[in-house]
Amino acid sequence: MKLHKKKLNITMTKQFIQKFPSNTVGSGGKTLLSKFQENSGLTETQIYILTQRVARLSSHLKNHNKDYSSQRGLRKLLGKRKRLLAYLSNEDVERYENLLIQLGIRGLKKI
């Protein structure tokens, strides 16, 4: 059961990455693409996929600014990405900072 679920998850990640090319996120798209296709369970991979979805949804909302369900979906995606970034910053600061640079996104606010 676990093996089937893992294969399905990897297949879905590959399909998502092919459907939404890496040119919408940051400058290191090609290297990120090959890295993230191998292991879809990595926190970095999940953040990368969420960043792709955020970019796509943001461009949709520029044209359809009254699409409130998409606005809600965007807020949910941003919250999930924020939680994953917080987890990664607590676990490994070096990986966290490298990911921020690769994806070209801002980090968490420091209090």
From Swiss-Prot:
GO cellular component, one term: ribonucleoprotein complex
Biological process per Gene Ontology, one example term: translation
Entry keyword annotation includes Chloroplast: yes
GO molecular function, one term: structural constituent of ribosome
Record key words, sorted: Chloroplast, Plastid, Ribonucleoprotein, Ribosomal protein
UniProt-annotated location(s): Plastid, Chloroplast
Record Pfam families: Ribosomal_S15 (PF00312)
InterPro entries: Ribosomal_uS15, Ribosomal_uS15_bac-type, uS15_NS1_RNA-bd_sf
Family note: Belongs to the universal ribosomal protein uS15 family.
Subunit structure: Part of the 30S ribosomal subunit.
Protein name (Swiss-Prot/TrEMBL): Small ribosomal subunit protein uS15c
Organism, scientific name: Staurastrum punctulatum (Green alga)
Gene encoding the protein: rps15
